[in-house]
Amino acid sequence: MSANVAAFPVPQPSIKITIAQGCLRYLDSKTPTLNHLNMTMPAGQWTCVLGRSGCGKTSLLRYLAGLLDQQIEWSGELKIEPANRALKDQIAYMAQQDLLMPWLSVLDNVLLSSKFGARGDFVAYDQKVQALTLLEKVGLADHANRLPQQLSGGMRQRVALARTLMQNKPVVLMDEPFSALDAVTRYRLQDLACTLLQDKTVVLITHDPQEAIRLAHHIYIMQGNPSTAAFLTTLESSTPRTFDAEGAQLQQRIMACLEHDDG
């Protein structure tokens, strides 16, 4: 079965997210993981965050998603515009792990969020069309009835991406969603994400400077101990970008920031 992207629901209004003087601390530690965090994530654009492993990038996403556990303390101001609903209710979150349900088929994993609001096991026909369209776009239409354990790691991650896109939320948090893919598939799915997430507010965690340069409108570098977010640049050109001489210079700037981080 096939359908085009135009069949998807009308996007919800984009949301601007602002963090002022954010501080995140584990209760068993005297030193915060994140401190004096000031960030602006403009509505309908991609904000990419880079930083060394363990600097708190994933904790930042989990805070935005409302997923921090009771062992973590957060202080600071979080502002969203428009503020008509709680941020956690307007977010789709794609973690580093695919988190697929092993007993559900690929198609049913993509439809998982649709099932939460359904009566019994009923899922509307148009939702199945949308899910199958996404599976076709990520190259897994022929695997819709397979179980996750029958897929490779990269294929599982593509299912997770399709499931995230299926939620059609105005804010999308992505924690290294393309890291397990081969180069060709990674580029193709970056292109797909740029198309399907157009006009959404996206916060992307990545270790790959080239990925940030290709996808971001705004780039932050997490630095120091405790970590804070240093704003690096705003990129005006349309995405996804080709990697040219200007991109190579920006990559050198990013690498210099990461290499000289004394955290």
Task: Locate each region found by the language model.
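Helix-to-loop junction immediately C-terminal to a conserved catalytic motif
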Residues: A65
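Short coil-to-helix segment of the ABC ATPase nucleotide-binding domain corresponding to the Q-loop/switch region
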Residues: L104-S113
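Conserved ABC ATPase "signature" region
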Residues: F122-H143
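Conserved ABC ATPase signature
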Residues: L147-L151, M155
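Helical segment within the ABC ATPase nucleotide-binding domain
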Residues: R186-Q198
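Conserved beta-strand-loop-alpha-helix hinge in the C-terminal portion
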Residues: G224-M255
